[in-house]
């Protein structure tokens, strides 16, 4: 009798401990998920604050902007150690290399003149005619007539390949759909238990890296127009289509780009083209084709600056141009799609 009572007591205790364990794990996972959601929505905001700070700890947010050689050249930047990236860190011996590409100095319509030219008086930190010189991250400083990169030193002054002094505004359309099997059912990742999201990626001609199909905002152009135009040019080769084909593409893109969308990020981008005086900023927007019907009727074809184009499964193994991997990660989190096998498996198993 005593043995049976002891057995029941032990079973009850074991059940209580098991339930407590599940409760704790569930609570922990909910906490982790809540943290992830909060983190994903503020990651770039926090990073931007760090970049515009002065403590010199920039290794995670200002790395590609210090790489050498500078893209499309043999120019080597002056080396900038992590602890001396921030402008408020005194560095009297800082001697950055001066470089502006010949293609920029040739004076194309998308490029500013040199600061030294007498007839050039840019209005920094404001709208300058049709040119947007305001930064999405707030005011930036001007030193000796040149704007100063809010993220810190890059080891190179001038504009490099960038046309504008100060912020150079771009737009990155992230087009997504669910990965489906031959029967049209959404495919779930076997470890995370979350559905697999795909996005349209292009292989850049200039550097050979895979990227989001985006591009520069033309003077006076709305961001929404840039997003649609760039996707059409790079992922659908719209520039080489007949008038009738262009109209058909436009109709289908209008349907995709006029629906609800997610603004993933606005602001400074850690880009290998950045210099001390010119830098990239972007607005990354996610347009999701929930059923896949819109994109099924559009044939992907690389065009303009793209060498290749394809649908790519989204996961943490992606290696993309500039900060594009972080944009894609945020999309996966916002859409509650698969990203990593490691971080989500425990919580999904509950």
Swiss-Prot record:
| UniProt keyword list | Hydrolase, Magnesium, Manganese, Mitochondrion, Phosphoprotein, Transit peptide
One GO BP annotation of this record: nucleobase-containing small molecule metabolic process
Transit peptide location on this chain: 1-46
Give cofactor(s), names only. Answer: Mg(2+); Mn(2+)
Q: Where is the Nudix hydrolase domain?
A: 178-334
Citing just one GO molecular function, the answer is: ADP-ribose diphosphatase activity
Q: How does it assemble?
A: Monomer. Interacts with GLOD4.
Return the protein name: ADP-ribose pyrophosphatase, mitochondrial
Organism, as annotated: Homo sapiens
Lineage of the source organism? Eukaryota, Metazoa, Chordata, Craniata, Vertebrata
